[in-house]
């Protein structure tokens, strides 16, 4: 029997990409899975596909009331919460400082940080009491942009660096009751979109990066699928396999950190 059998897992952004892969994996592990998903169509698809195995709630991660509404349903269904996975996010399609108009940069910043940072903070706030009671865990999705430049523009990169600080602070504040960790995947097959303020809400990451381009920069030389990254989340959520880790961020970068030096700077053609 899996360590996660009957564990109550709450995942944001479970309708596509990595979030959907996490929903699938935790259901396979025997967990009671719930998700907060912005898209009504994706909520309907989740319910049709997984039936009674999923509690799919339509809502916005930038709205505390939506978190609370989802959590109330989770506690009614399961009586507890064992792990919160903050995963919903948006990307900036490498929108650069120089080429982005100031007004757009400002509005894009607020929209992106509201989702990528405030969304995590509000989720942590809503879930903390239940996780303290269960002595559970939080896991937040980062990115290779939490460690390296060039995985996005300044908006996205700054948001993921901010999330690392949030993980450390929450791990400190919630110890010893709640373990708080992060997983930073590299580029993958995903429907990740951008901010509406940047005109990117209908543009997915795969329209900016081809599978060949992603595979070419990775020392492991393959194009990752979302399911390739679910293992670290399962390990971190497991009470038996992760009693000792908190404030830890797993850099699941397919070897990016071991690359040799190729480019001195990204602005040589300015």
UniProtKB/Swiss-Prot annotation:
BP GO terms, sorted: 3-phenylpropionate catabolic process
Record-annotated membrane-spanning stretches: none
EC number annotated for this UniProt entry: 1.3.1.87
One Pfam family, short name: adh_short
NAD listed as a keyword: yes
Principal EC category: oxidoreductase
Catalysed reaction equations from the record: 3-(cis-5,6-dihydroxycyclohexa-1,3-dien-1-yl)propanoate + NAD(+) = 3-(2,3-dihydroxyphenyl)propanoate + NADH + H(+); (2E)-3-(cis-5,6-dihydroxycyclohexa-1,3-dien-1-yl)prop-2-enoate + NAD(+) = (2E)-3-(2,3-dihydroxyphenyl)prop-2-enoate + NADH + H(+)
Pathway: Aromatic compound metabolism; 3-phenylpropanoate degradation
Top-level taxon of origin: Bacteria
PROSITE patterns linked to this entry: ADH_SHORT
Residues bound to NAD(+): 10-34
Residues involved in substrate binding: 143
GO molecular function (one): 2,3-dihydroxy-2,3-dihydro-phenylpropionate dehydrogenase activity
Recorded coiled-coil stretches: none
Disulfide bonds: none
InterPro entries in UniProt: BphB-like_SDR, Dihydrodiol_DH_HcaB, NAD(P)-bd_dom_sf, Sc_DH/Rdtase_CS, SDR_fam
The keyword DNA repair is annotated on this UniProt entry: no
Keywords: Aromatic hydrocarbons catabolism, NAD, Oxidoreductase
UniProt cross-references to NCBIfam families, sorted A to Z: 3PPDhyd_Dh_HcaB (NF042950), PRK06200.1 (NF004849)
Family statement: Belongs to the short-chain dehydrogenases/reductases (SDR) family.
Function statement: Converts 3-phenylpropionate-dihydrodiol (PP-dihydrodiol) and cinnamic acid-dihydrodiol (CI-dihydrodiol) into 3-(2,3-dihydroxylphenyl)propanoic acid (DHPP) and 2,3-dihydroxicinnamic acid (DHCI), respectively.
Protein known as: 3-phenylpropionate-dihydrodiol/cinnamic acid-dihydrodiol dehydrogenase
Taxonomic lineage of the native organism: Bacteria, Pseudomonadati, Pseudomonadota, Gammaproteobacteria, Enterobacterales
């Amino acid at each position: 029997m899996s360590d996660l059998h009957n564990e109550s897992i709450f995942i944001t952004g479970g309708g596509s990409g990595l979030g959907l892969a996490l929903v699938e994996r935790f259901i396979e592990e025997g967990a009671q899975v719930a998700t907060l998903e912005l898209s009504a169509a994706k909520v309907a698809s989740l319910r049709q596909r997984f039936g009674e195995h999923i509690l799919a709630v339509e809502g916005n991660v930038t709205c505390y009331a939506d978190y609370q509404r989802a959590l109330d349903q989770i506690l009614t269904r399961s009586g507890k919460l064992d792990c919160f996975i903050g995963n919903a996010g948006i990307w900036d399609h490498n929108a650069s400082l120089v080429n982005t108009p100031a007004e757009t940069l400002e509005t894009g910043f607020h929209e992106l940080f509201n989702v990528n940072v405030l969304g995590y903070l509000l989720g942590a706030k809503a879930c903390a009491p239940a996780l303290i009671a269960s002595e559970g865990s939080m896991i937040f999705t980062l990115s290779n942009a939490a460690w390296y430049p060039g995985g996005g523009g300044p908006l996205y990169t700054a948001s993921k660096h901010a999330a690392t600080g949030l993980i450390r602070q929450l791990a400190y504040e919630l110890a010893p009751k709640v373990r708080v960790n992060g997983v930073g995947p590299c580029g993958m097959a995903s429907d990740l979109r951008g901010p509406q303020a940047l005109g990117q809400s209908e543009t997915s990451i795969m329209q900016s990066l081809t599978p060949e381009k992603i595979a070419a920069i990775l020392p492991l030389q393959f194009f990752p699928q979302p399911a390739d990254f679910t293992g670290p989340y399962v390990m971190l959520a497991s009470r038996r396999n992760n009693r000792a880790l908190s404030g830890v961020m797993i850099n699941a970068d397919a070897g990016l950190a071991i690359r040799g030096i190729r480019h001195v700077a990204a602005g040589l053609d300015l």
